[in-house]
A protein has these predicted regions:
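Aromatic/basic-lined ligand-recognition segments
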Residues: 1, 69-78, 82, 93, ...
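N-terminal low-complexity, intrinsically disordered segments
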Residues: 1-85, 91
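Macromolecular interaction modules
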Residues: 9, 13-15, 170-172, 245-246
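Conserved short hydrophobic interaction patches
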Residues: 36, 40, 107-118, 230-233, ...
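Short, highly charged C-terminal tails/helix-capping segments
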Residues: 55-58, 127-134, 239-251
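Aromatic- and glycine-enriched beta-alpha-beta binding-site module
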Residues: 83-132
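Long, compositionally biased interface segments
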Residues: 195-251
Length: 251
């Protein structure tokens, strides 16, 4: 997050940009994008074809041949950054080692600028900044409240040892206009280890400031401000979601 913790529970940070369907899109654009960034992202993988669904759940007219597309997944040399590009979509993932917010933000801006440079005028329909954390509890029995400040409180006779739990809350923000999807739970990783999940996804969509004025996507001002505000909100939610003693142990 903003403060670089000595012990980071972060496993992945990502920013997802979804744009309005554009006549400027063509199937050659992902490979043109790769050609521009291949020195930084030498590994390129074509993912299985994706059938797009428009915002609002309305299916895209599949008679348009370029709407059922394979996405390109680009990786840097140490696999710490993954960029996905597809029709009206750009996703920037940052895995470990995660350095700091400023570097991640600048990476998002560079990749977004490259996308806009290649496709031309675009409108942003949805943007999300998401941080996924895995907290490793001790083996055996443990109390969730040792780690999280947001946890299930159950009355008797339900006050029993939990085999698992999942909680999802959605909080509305005014500035910027957004929803924070806050998820906690117990999950099992691919290696079989059980961890506590803290997943924070800050999402703005149907963005009035862009759609109502018919402006094109502006990376130089509005988007930079949105990223910084979104990160501040996610960081505050992260800190307040943790037991204060546990948070101190991470610093």
């Amino acid at each position: 997050m903003g403060e670089l913790l000595t012990k980071q529970p972060l496993v992945e940070a990502l920013c997802e940009l979804r744009f309005s369907p554009s006549d400027q899109w063509d199937t050659a654009l992902p490979k043109r994008f790769y050609a521009e960034v291949k020195d930084e992202f030498p590994e390129c993988t074509e993912l299985n074809p994706v059938f797009q669904v428009a915002v609002g759940g309305q299916p895209v007219d599949m008679s348009e041949p370029n709407k059922a597309l394979s996405r390109l997944q680009l990786r840097n040399k140490d696999n710490s950054v993954v960029v996905q590009i597809g029709a009206d979509l750009l996703v920037v993932h940052h895995l470990q080692p995660y350095t700091n917010w400023e570097n991640f933000r600048d990476l998002i801006l560079r990749m977004g600028s490259k996308y806009v440079e290649l496709i031309g005028e675009v409108k942003l329909e949805r943007v999300g900044l998401r941080y996924i954390n895995h907290i490793s509890p001790p083996e055996g029995r443990f109390e969730i409240e040792q780690f999280l400040s947001v946890f299930p409180i159950l009355p008797s006779p339900l006050n029993l040892d939990l085999a698992g739990f999942s909680q999802v809350y959605e909080f509305q923000y005014v500035q910027p206009k957004a929803v924070l999807k806050h998820q906690t739970g117990i999950v099992q990783r691919g290696d079989g280890k059980v961890v506590l999940l803290l997943d924070l996804d800050f999402i703005s969509q149907g963005i009035e400031s862009i759609e109502s004025s018919n402006k094109i996507f502006d990376l130089s001002s509005w988007f930079q401000n949105w990223l910084n505000q979104a990160h501040d909100c996610v960081e505050a939610a992260f800190i307040s979601s943790l037991n204060p003693d546990y948070y101190e142990s991470l610093r």
